[in-house]
Curated annotation (Swiss-Prot):
Reported function: Peptide chain release factor 2 directs the termination of translation in response to the peptide chain termination codons UGA and UAA.
Location, primary (coarse class): cytoplasm
Species in which this protein is naturally found: Campylobacter lari (strain RM2100 / D67 / ATCC BAA-1060)
Keywords for this protein: Cytoplasm, Methylation, Protein biosynthesis
Name of the protein in question: Peptide chain release factor 2
Gene Ontology cellular component annotations, sorted alphabetically: cytoplasm
Amino acid sequence: MDNYEYSELLKKLKNKVGNIASIIKPEEIKARLKEIENLENSPSFWSDVKQAGIIGKEKTKISNLLKNYENAFNALNDASELFDLANSENDLDTIQALFDDAPNLEDLIVSLEISMLLSGENDGKNAIVSIHPGAGGTESNDWASMLYRMYLRFCEREGFKVETLDFQEGEEAGLKDVSFLVKGENAYGYLKAENGIHRLVRTSPFDSAGRRHTSFSSVMVSPELDDDIEIEIEDKDIRIDYYRASGAGGQHVNKTESAVRITHMPSGIVVQCQNDRSQHKNKATAFKMLKSRLYELELMKQQDEANSSEKSEIGWGHQIRSYVLFPYQQVKDTRSNEAFSQVDNILDGDIKKMIEGVLIAQKAQD
């Protein structure tokens, strides 16, 4: 990097931060935080626990956004002033230190961008994730299991908590189906980028001839809905089946019909839950999963209508990413058009940067 390149980088980052400021309006955030502070000082505020909780979440979200903005704004100003001073004094060591720190400065601006992109209505919610292997038997089941592990490792890295709702093992390897709840700040905001078809190309460990195989698995992500959101489901539109739980689950497995499957006929959506010994609790969870899926489906329809000139790529049936393990190693996302060679790291849950690239690319297309 030289002086010209660094000057151009500062210009680009200042322009980006300026654009972000025009969108998030920091002064309005400060005014709203002051307003919330005054509300919290009123004794009557805490009498409505539900409303207090909603405002508390808003306060946390906009406080974090303002903090990220101020960190980025101050760091950029400091770097710019130091660069000008170092140039005027011909301080080559300081200039080189600024060059070396340039990637960190860029990361700070990206962090601000992501904070802005995760300020949507549902982004702060928990996420319900389901993984379904495509056709292909053992090979696809194993791929679904690899994706499941990838998301579990991602959740560990991000400090998200995971609760398994339904798990069905494959006959020889992998899994037939898994659904799980991810709890944490912006869980849905991040994981919504995983909605779609994931493609794997590799030499199959299950093929004695060592041939190359292509497998597919679909990932479906929906926000966990608050209880106050009304989703109407008519009895005539659903079929409820009860069956014995399978897979890991202790001594009660296969002894009682505690597992629940709900089929929503108009949409074709099927959800199932065998997480609990209680059929009643599993049924309640399955209904919650169904409501979240129907809500997500409605969001997708609205997205399609908003992009009527060009059908939206956000959907459960669209191939979003390819993971190639043979004859070369690469993970490529079709939405951001970014390619990554650290395949092992990605399959071990290092997917945050890839997800952030998708969120930024999708915002640029809006």
